[in-house]
Amino acid sequence: MNYVFSTTDTVVYRFPTHVNELVLDRSESTVTEVFIVVLEPGEAPPLHKHPDTEQVFYVLEGEAELRIGPEAAEHFRVKPGDVVRIPPDTWHKIANDGRVPVRYMSVDAFPGARPADEPTWDDHVRAICAAQSWDFASIKRSK
């Protein structure tokens, strides 16, 4: 059993909209997963929600705009040192509207247990790729 996980020895997932650096796979935990999100200037994942997941973000570098709600009507400025909580089933997105990369740690918690239909991070990424018509093999990379 692992107790310590490195943020520098990660598996990288380069989506068309952002990068995720996997630190702790959900398969190695009871109800959590951890990854670093990197947004280059102009990048933003699409507005989305997770019905079965609460997310906590810790902003490490850069400033970004957090948008909340189905119409992304609520706007918040986030900066290094800020902690963001996204309750389950909440529409959200973080957009890098600046000139330098944004990095934040995401800790995902699954109330009760991790999703049975996506027991690993790779399973989750495959589902995202299928929904977006992205190629999984081109997204998963070593760091």
Question: Which sequence ranges carry the predicted segments?
Answer:
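A generic "binding-loop/recognition-motif" signal
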Residues: V19, E43, D52-T53, E71, ...
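Short histidine-centered beta-strand/loop micro-motifs
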Residues: L24-R26, P46-P51, I68, H75-R77, ...
